[in-house]
Amino acid sequence: MPLPEPSEQEGESVKAGQEPSSKPGTEVVPAAPRKPREFSKLVLLTASKDSTKVAGAKRKGVHCVMSLGVPGPATLAKALLQTHPEAQRAIEAAPQEPEQKRSRQDPGADRTEDSGLAAGPPEAAGENSAPCSVAPGKSL
């Protein structure tokens, strides 16, 4: 039984608008066009000595987070609360058990801990004075 010519096979398998492929079974199917993603408002991060620029940005509805040092947990939470009101409700609803357990400890126990994480919130010692484990003059 004679086999059909290769050109006849290609002619049958090729659909309108497609070019025949060099190898059978390797046809390229174009991807469907995708709808571009829509992004929510982006957070503008700036560091400016001019407070009028920062105030102007806030008036326009842009949240501005300024940090010149290592941000602590309170700083990060504050930025998150300003950006996402849903997150604020979730954080307020979260139980405060770890802090309550810490407050019940012996006051002398804090002196034995040498960790910067056991210290109070960064606001108590200044916003930008978070402890750093890198010695001066050395890079990460």
UniProtKB/Swiss-Prot annotation:
Task: Name the coiled-coil region(s).
Answer: none
InterPro entries per UniProt:
FLYWCH_N (IPR029279), FWCH1/FWCH2 (IPR040312)
Gene that encodes it? FLYWCH2
Q: Which organism is it from?
A: Pongo abelii
Q: Which Pfam families match?
A: FLYWCH_N (PF15423)
Q: Report the residues modified as Phosphoserine.
A: S21
Q: Where is this region: Disordered?
A: 1-39, 83-140
Bias type Low complexity, positions: 118-127
Q: Which domain of life is it from?
A: Eukaryota
Q: Cite the entry's keywords alphabetically.
A: Phosphoprotein
Which cysteine pairs make disulfide bonds?
Answer: none
Feature: compositional bias, Basic and acidic residues: 98-114
| Name of this protein | FLYWCH family member 2
